[in-house]
Amino acid sequence: MDRDSLPRVPDTHGDVVDEKLFSDLYIRTSWVDAQVALDQIDKGKARGSRTAIYLRSVFQSHLETLGSSVQKHAGKVLFVAILVLSTFCVGLKSAQIHSKVHQLWIQEGGRLEAELAYTQKTIGEDESATHQLLIQTTHDPNASVLHPQALLAHLEVLVKATAVKVHLYDTEWGLRDMCNMPSTPSFEGIYYIEQILRHLIPCSIITPLDCFWEGSQLLGPESAVVIPGLNQRLLWTTLNPASVMQYMKQKMSEEKISFDFETVEQYMKRAAIGSGYMEKPCLNPLNPNCPDTAPNKNSTQPPDVGAILSGGCYGYAAKHMHWPEELIVGGAKRNRSGHLRKAQALQSVVQLMTEKEMYDQWQDNYKVHHLGWTQEKAAEVLNAWQRNFSREVEQLLRKQSRIATNYDIYVFSSAALDDILAKFSHPSALSIVIGVAVTVLYAFCTLLRWRDPVRGQSSVGVAGVLLMCFSTAAGLGLSALLGIVFNAASTQVVPFLALGLGVDHIFMLTAAYAESNRREQTKLILKKVGPSILFSACSTAGSFFAAAFIPVPALKVFCLQAAIVMCSNLAAALLVFPAMISLDLRRRTAGRADIFCCCFPVWKEQPKVAPPVLPLNNNNGRGARHPKSCNNNRVPLPAQNPLLEQRADIPGSSHSLASFSLATFAFQHYTPFLMRSWVKFLTVMGFLAALISSLYASTRLQDGLDIIDLVPKDSNEHKFLDAQTRLFGFYSMYAVTQGNFEYPTQQQLLRDYHDSFVRVPHVIKNDNGGLPDFWLLLFSEWLGNLQKIFDEEYRDGRLTKECWFPNASSDAILAYKLIVQTGHVDNPVDKELVLTNRLVNSDGIINQRAFYNYLSAWATNDVFAYGASQGKLYPEPRQYFHQPNEYDLKIPKSLPLVYAQMPFYLHGLTDTSQIKTLIGHIRDLSVKYEGFGLPNYPSGIPFIFWEQYMTLRSSLAMILACVLLAALVLVSLLLLSVWAAVLVILSVLASLAQIFGAMTLLGIKLSAIPAVILILSVGMMLCFNVLISLGFMTSVGNRQRRVQLSMQMSLGPLVHGMLTSGVAVFMLSTSPFEFVIRHFCWLLLVVLCVGACNSLLVFPILLSMVGPEAELVPLEHPDRISTPSPLPVRSSKRSGKSYVVQGSRSSRGSCQKSHHHHHKDLNDPSLTTITEEPQSWKSSNSSIQMPNDWTYQPREQRPASYAAPPPAYHKAAAQQHHQHQGPPTTPPPPFPTAYPPELQSIVVQPEVTVETTHSDSNTTKVTATANIKVELAMPGRAVRSYNFTS
């Protein structure tokens, strides 16, 4: 028999380790063929779990059938696979990519999704405001921006940027077309007064410049307003609203033009619109345009910017436009009196409409009648203007070197953020090509065989890597066809991660393929490693599916796509790659080299010449034909010396580098080193110390994923978010109240709910330490003023119970109309209420019966306060324009409210722990008042993006518990041992604890992304440990021997898989996204490192100490099974031929027919050493001859060469004679041996009787006796000769 045909442990290099002389059938029986192990138990030659081995045999039979079918139809399988994979790849053309933050990182499910759905359903949009922000910082972190030059530079940038235009749909759009500005009252009669107000009321811009006269330069208007009779072009830089109003009132009175100036005066009075910017200090007192009324006009001293900015700034309407200091100044330091002494940044906010507000604003305007105006077009106009704003700032900084030299100016808008996310969300073709090229090169180099090109695997290995790339692309295409939307997480991570994990399957298959060239190779490969690959892919895909329960859309999509790709890779590894192996077998059989097999001639290996070992009466020729003649002539052939052949391949020879293999290293060096007592002690102590330290460090693990990590690094938006988070930590939020609540009767509960936010940390207070007024307080205040005016004029006799007189004021008449409202639709007015009814009581509680009638009047006649309240009342109150000369007393009643909000400003939120504490505090308030009967919820960026952390740890713990429970069941099914599964799960738990500790040391905070990686790490750790456990369970011997055999089998695939996965993960460092680098790249590398240490170092030692019992325990030999029975022979009466079951056909042809013994399979029991007699045989004689010079040596005293696997039994030949002869004498062993004498020479004489009955009742009886002698030549392979007698 050819020595290369002996089944061996797979070697990743394809090297045949000569020291490995036991076949896998004897020492890994259930791994190679569970049916043989089952037969051993049935015959009482071994004990073990019969159920477990039976189930394993069922698995193996199915995989063997699959392998046979694939090998038989290899070309067809490849053709169909290419068609299917190509079809799925076409699906990539339909892939959609989501890049907007709110589409990707907002938690799905739970209360947050219900709250957002309620907001969307009620008011038709999720966002409450759109902002264009600008931050200015200094280059020098120690410098301050609290000086006039910094504010003037800030002004120059803002003036240029806010003046940009955008041309869309044949229309020009500017800031005034889309900015958020206060509403103006409507008038009847003289329309131009209303037009003047609309042109003068500017956009709302939150800026520190509002503390100075220069802030007026931002307000415009673009073209000066001309008032008839007033020889002045009105601009906010020269406008004194109070004096202009007095002039107009006087002028129109002189001209006897009737106009309700009282309404305008009340409008200005309630908003505290006075002198505008005329009395504010100038940044440059020497500027000739600085008004004479400025307090520092012509002053030679620069203004004290810090003192002026302390406490915040006020806009032109002081009552409703107070910009908190924390919003406009960042990185502030104060003196003892609390005044600003130093600041690092200035911030301005241009407030824009939302897309729905802009759509509603222009829906009925002539400007868009020809456009087919839609909300989508409104959004496009808004986004285009924001892009132009950012572009204008960039161009200005390039032109104005003075500003760029001293300051950093960052612009941020939601449109710019969406653009840059969309730009970088597409996969990088260069990174993918580099990753594939490196993996292909690694596979080529590790699978290349320099000394034996025929048995090399580099070509099929490279084909396997390319197949994994193909199947990965097909899996992503299938995801696109299924409607799964891509995002930055999936496009940047999935291709590399899938390639790294998929190549692991290729190395496992090539490791098994490294065995000898055999006809049924494919089915045997799948029979051995198929269960491991199936388990590995299932555990990884299962981990991804489990991680999909993390309620973050971006990660949910990532997990689903990764799971689909893993299933695609599994199908390619079990169906397509074996077909490639089947085709490569033909190359091996043809004797062609691995590389350029079509270019080089057939490779002919030079035979090794060695001194012959000629046992007495034995003829042997390795791989030679043995002519069989009737006269029993024998031709002696020279034999090879296996001992010399063995020495030619030992390390240290001239070819030691080329012949190095991880399997040999694991068996001869690595595992024996691990099994030393002091190594075990140090490893276990180090492992326990690392575990304890990790558990302690994990208690300090913080939650958090900053928004800055979601933005590509080195972008302007990334720099803005870094400065904003570090210097401001400013956010806006809203407390939303819902429907199913009686607002008129529960006003005090609403007030208490609002007042409760005073005690919430990080909420900005007003100058008095309280909170800004919300809509109900402004509503009540307006009614209170009307009630006060009515009471005064009623006492003066300007109004009576039945009517009012011409000298009554407009507000008193409006109050009269409000007082007589009953609140009933069928009887809306009752004048009797004038004497008894009050608009508000002494506590500020609004009249409950007419609450919604009053609301209609307030929303229309106090529009500045209504808009400034940011209440977003829905349904929107009905309109009622009050006219003093209108005698209809009926006021329309608004619909009951189902949505209202209270605005709050938050500051100092620089990390997730602070935001999480704030969310918890506000959520507690929400739950508390929910119990009081007020349906409510908070809204805003902190709740949208950080809500996931409130339940993240409990959700992660629950998912991990379910995954570990499922893993316990799955591992138990694969290993068929509960104790082995428990050890694997314990190892995984320890690895998780170490990963938590490593996250703390690396500063990686716990968020949804690390949660997904932690769940995935369970599947990866299972793959590492289960492969070692499987080898341990299926090996024969004591624990240390089984660990040695297990590491010999698994070290190569594990190391190669980890290295290729590491290369693929390392390629993630090229991503422009910080979250990909920190949370995917770094954390996956940590998982691989922890997995490598625990699985390759700690777990083998754990198995050697408390590992489970082997599946099969031989009863006759400690380190191998008993020799299996030969295959029964089936005879055919009709054809006169005999068949060997599961073997090759034999014929009773002529004596001259030659036989090729080297094609026999050692795994076939019929070719093994015969040590038993089946029931159909009759044993007539057997004897055992022992050499006299043998002495027993204990295992401890045997030579060091026993560290290698013990030599295998070899077949000796026997001769067949026509007459019985005595057994031949046994030659002396060629060298001393340490093995028992019964292994040296075995002689068996079975007697076979065959009876044949013919139709003529004649019976022919033939009795044949064969003397079969088996000799074992140590330590090399036996020299064989066959002697037949009959």
UniProtKB/Swiss-Prot annotation:
Transmembrane feature ranges: 77-92, 428-448, 466-486, 493-511, 533-553, 563-583, 678-699, 932-952, 956-976, 1008-1028, 1057-1077, 1083-1103
Biased composition (Low complexity): 1199-1216
Principal location: membrane
Keyword Glycoprotein: yes
GO molecular function terms listed in the Swiss-Prot or TrEMBL record: hedgehog family protein binding; hedgehog receptor activity; lipoprotein particle receptor activity; phosphatidic acid binding; phosphatidylinositol-4-phosphate binding; smoothened binding
Deletion consequences: Embryonic lethal with epidermal pattern formation defects.
Function comment: Segmentation polarity protein. Acts as a receptor for the hedgehog protein (hh). Associates with the smoothened protein (SMO) to transduce the hedgehog signal leading to the activation of wingless, decapentaplegic and patched itself. Participates in cell interactions that establish pattern within the segment and the imaginal disks during development. In the absence of HH, represses the constitutive signaling activity of smo through fused (FU).
Name of the protein this chain belongs to: Protein patched
Record organism: Drosophila melanogaster
